[in-house]
Each structure stands twice: as C-alpha cells, then as structure tokens.
C-alpha cells in the first residue's frame, strides 16, 4: 500500500529514504548529493578549450523500456550525428563555388585589359557586385530565415544562386566571342566588355551570396557537435575547389589537342567550371534532408498538443512489508515483461556539456530513435493548477509510484517572472487503482513552478500479449519545457512561455536596419575584424595574377599580341594561377588541422597567427623577384583564407549560446542566425567595394601592381592588432552570472 502524500514528511518527499532505494544504491552512489551540481548554458564559460566532454553529475539508473511507435513522436528537430559523407556532400557547393571563383579571379583582369579597358577603370568592375551584395545580402538572409518552401529554407536559395553563378560564368568567359558575334570588331569590343562586366557582376554576386545559405544550411541540419566539423569541412572543400580551379587555369590548353578542338583556353575553362559547379550543386541539394519551416500561423502540435506521445516513468518500489509480494516488473533489473531492454539506454541526469551548448541533451534525446524507446518521467516542480490524471480502475495494475530525488525547499528561486516552484506529489487512492500526479497547491489559477503547466501525455501500450494489458493507455505527466529540451535542444524562456506563438513581425528594410544598428557589441567587433581580414585578402586575391604578370615577369598586357612583353604577361598570369593553387591547397591543409590546433591554441592566438602570416607574406612578396620565393609565400595566404571561412562563424555559434545575445521574442530583440551570418558576409562586400575604389588609383599612382601588395600587407597588420585587442572571444559572465547557480531546467 502506498502511503498518502499528506502522510509523507516533507524531507522524505524531497529526498526518499535509503531503505526503499536499496535497488538504486549500487549504481548511483551519492546521487542525492549531486543536486547542487547542475548545468546551465554557461557552464563552460564559452571556452572552446579543452574540447573534452565532461560529465556534470552522476547518472541515476536507467528506467524500464517501453515500446512506442516512432511515427507517433515528432523528432524532426533533433539532429543526429552526421556522417563524414553527409557533411562532405553538404559542403560540395563550396568546392564548386570556389572552383568558379578561381577562374574568375584569375582571368577577369587579364581578359578586360586585353579587350582595351583602361587601367583606371578595371578595378571598378568589382564595384557593382559588392554594392548589390551589401544591400541584398541581409535581405536574402532574413528571407531565408522565414522561407516556408517545401524544399526547406536554404536549399531554394542555394539552387537559384548556383544558377545565377553559372549564367554569369557563361557571360564572363564567352563575352568576347558573343560580342564578336553581335557587332564587335577588332580593336573595338564594346559589346564584349559590356557582357563580360555583366557576367562578372552576376557571377561575383551569386558566388558570394551562395556561401551564406550553405553555411546556414549546415548549421540548421547539424547538432552543435557537428557544426565545428562541418565548418572545417566547408573550408577544406573551398580550399580544394580553389586549388583545382587554379590547376585547370594554369594549364596551357591552347597547346593541347583538346584545347584546340574546343576553341581555345577560355572554352576549356568554361567547360570544366560549368560541369563542376552543376555536379557539386546537385550533391549539396541531396546531401541532408532539410525540414520545411512551418508557417507562423501553424501551431506546433509536437510542443503544444496534450496528446504528445511520450513514455511513462520508471517504477520505484515502496518499502517491502512482511506480507507484501513483489510485482511482476521490479526496479531491480530495470526491465519488465512488457518492455524488453533497449540496446541503447539514455542515462538520465548525466547531461553533458560541450562549448556551453546542450549537446548532451540532444544526444540523450536522439537515443530514443531505437526499436524500443526508453521511458522517462522527469518528476520536478510544477506547482500549478493541474487536473489529476487517472488510469482507469478497471485495469489491473500493481500499486506503484515513482519519484526521482528532488531539490530541497527554496532551492529554486524566483527570477524574471518565474515564481518559486512548489513541490509536486504522487498520490494513490486506498484501493491502489488510481495513480494521481498533481500539485499540493491546487487552488492557484495558473502555473507557478519553474516549469510550465504539465501536459497529459497519452501513450498506447503496443507491446505484450492479449487481454486488457495490451489495450490500456498510460497517462504520463510531462512538463512542456522538459519536452522542449528532449525534442528541440536549447530553447529560451521567451519561446517556452508562449511568446513564440505570436505572429512574427513582417520583414521590412527599417526593421532590418534596426537589427544592423542595434547589433551586440560582440558581433560588431567581430564584423570589424572580419572586414579588415577580407580587405587585406581581397586586395591580394583580385590582382595577384596581374601582379605576377607585370611585376614578377615584367610583362605588358596592352602590348601587341605578337610581342615578347605580351607573351611574358600571359606566362605570368599562368604562373599566378599556380601560385593561387598553392594558396588554395595550403588553405585546405590548414582547414584540416585547424580543429586540432583549436585544442592547443585559443581563437585569439589563431587569429593573430593568420593575420601576421598574411602580412609578412604579402610584404615580402614585393621585396623579391625570385619566382620560387614568391610562390612559396602563397602558403601564408591560405592560412588567412581558412581562418576567415571558419573562426568567425564558429564564434558566432558560441555567441548564440548567450541568451542576452540571442534576444527574446517577447520584446522584439530576437536575432536570426541567417541575418547575422549575412551581416558577417556583408563585411566581405564592404571590403570589396573599398578595394575596387582604392586599388585602381593606387596602382596608377605607384606605377605597378606592387601597390596592391603594400596595401594588403598594411591592412593585415592592422587586423592583427585589432583581433588581439578588441574582438570579444567570450561573452562576459556578468550579464547572467546568477545563472551559474541554478539547476539545468530553469533556464534551458
């Protein structure tokens, strides 16, 4: 017979005596003392190192397993661990984009100069695309955040931008031939110049904009544990794509039978680039299924419906009396005749922290995807006006009750509108036929605990033989916020209190500008640092082949085509492609080892090394005319490129673990990952705008392409200082220091 709830002393209700828990003792020694060991979203203080996962508190015993049809449970928001193949295919679009971009950067300047574009104007070709990107990139990011296409939020944008890049590439590499077919004559390529410039703008904008939905796509479908791997694979594939692109561009196809058959160097390059971009785009689109975004008006049944199926709680036996007999399923071996053991049993209470994210909870919840789903009831404070839940008395059932160890009175404190939790109780009638789960204080009109009002979760018992045992429905009390933890990972309080049900504000330019102007300080400093990095890198990248042709090989792009100076310039452009190939492969190699380096070096140190190496590499290239020295310095360019493609987005993911940074839907400060990724990418466009405005006149003033390398070296050293002194690598704990002293479920 289970004693009534009123007869249980408060101390025993919170911490059950050891005698009834003899079956637990061997596996959870000292569990009651672990209630003060908790996990908040700041438990790791946003430190990325060390990356080893640590157990926050010991595990109580696993409960019995209860069969549950998987189709009844919505696990759509859970992200299982992705395989290397999935992450590789997901990042293939970066390979194709960088392959195409390598062709663009290698051949745009030489092609335009050879068609007669003046020196003062050729840098302005890069001016239009970044302006479009700067104006449209945040809008595209915000639009993708709210896209409700059945193909997902990111994949439609990836497809459209890839098509735009392919069309721009067609105009860029075939503009001269199309112009001649229209009206151009030798010495006057006005149509060819117009088509080539349009192709550069379309190709550059589409290629740069495709990076953002591809990064957001990976972050949407991957757990936090896979996001670092995904970013590194993205940078690796981007480096490999650029490397192979420069290899193709560095071959003299005019001297091969294949090149002569296709009609020249540019035709071969176009064929390789079009095929590569098309194949990689298809691989990315089919890599990982993307779940469509529900319209704002559609309610989320998995979170709000009281019929959400979840398994029942584990039984814990009362004190055995002299005349009592044990029921058929006991807590000794934690299994039952109707519930065979699961091959993968989650350990309740052993939540794991990594990089301040609740990765362990996602892994814990993802373990439900087995043949036999483990049952769970996290019995904690509800303190609300809850109706009693009853199992029909006609169904035979052993008189059992369950409760996990609870925190003492006053352990949970009132904060930010959440009232102090009150103790819940499990009561049973005298006949033992009814199992009631409710609150001691039932007079309150609304929930006042740390968790919101529990939902009634009905589960059909699908296992077992015939008779009433097979048709009974088990009613389980499960808090909505706990369900959010298990099924959705990290959810902030504003989303769990019902504010997420409100219709989101419509997207507008004014609201977007407000988001940009009111960006957090951490994001602002990261954007400035990102801008300096791209400013130095783009100055080198866009004009490196011209630097090799004019400075290193002493050629002249405007000389007669039969002259030696013109041939030297072409040889320099080809050798510049091989230099860019070295840079791209060094970027791929550095991306492969960057994750290992993060275990030994801080992000600040890695930033410092990247900027310093690039500044030295570009500066020393202007002091030497030795071809091998200049080519070997290209290794330093890959270090900065890999850093710019990885570390800013990794820091942004860390920032989003801060509740203050992410904002709240209730007060309209909620931020979107797509918008913030676009804000980071806008720094690339700003850098390209400044490069296009400054480097043309600077090159004319200096008299050679050496001015480009001087500029890049100087800006890189400025970025080195800024990344060391101003960038915020850890969100200060003062914004929510008290959260370190609260249990796990309070602020999840």
Swiss-Prot record:
GO MF annotation: an example: D-glucose:proton symporter activity
InterPro entries (alphabetical): MFS, MFS_trans_sf
Compartment(s) where it occurs, according to its Swiss-Prot or TrEMBL record: Membrane
UniProt entry keywords in alphabetical sequence: Disease variant, Epilepsy, Intellectual disability, Membrane, Phosphoprotein, Sugar transport, Symport, Transmembrane, Transmembrane helix, Transport
GO biological process: D-glucose transmembrane transport; galactose transmembrane transport
Disordered, as annotated region: 294-339
GO cellular component: membrane
Transmembrane segments: 93-113, 123-143, 155-175, 191-211, 233-253, 268-288, 533-553, 573-593, 600-620, 627-647, 685-705, 708-728
Keyword DNA damage: no
Catalytic activity field: D-galactose(in) + H(+)(in) = D-galactose(out) + H(+)(out); D-glucose(out) + H(+)(out) = D-glucose(in) + H(+)(in)
SUPFAM superfamilies assigned to the protein according to its UniProt record, in alphabetical order: MFS general substrate transporter
Cross-referenced Pfam families: MFS_1
Sites of Phosphothreonine modification: 497
Membrane disposition: Multi-pass membrane protein
Tissue specificity comment: Expressed in adult heart, brain, muscle and kidney, with very strong expression in brain. Also expressed in fetal brain, kidney and lung.
CDD domains found in the cross-reference section: MFS_SLC45_SUC
Positions with biased composition (Pro residues): 308-317
Entry function: Proton-associated glucose transporter in the brain.
PANTHER family given in the database record: PROTON-ASSOCIATED SUGAR TRANSPORTER A, SUGAR TRANSPORTER
Stated family: Belongs to the glycoside-pentoside-hexuronide (GPH) cation symporter transporter (TC 2.A.2) family.
Medical condition linked: Intellectual developmental disorder with neuropsychiatric features: An autosomal recessive disorder characterized by moderate to severe intellectual disability, epilepsy, and variable neuropsychiatric features, such as anxiety, obsessive-compulsive behavior, and autistic features. Mild facial dysmorphism may also be present.
Name listed for the protein in its UniProt record: Proton-associated sugar transporter A
Organism whose genome encodes this protein: Homo sapiens (Human)
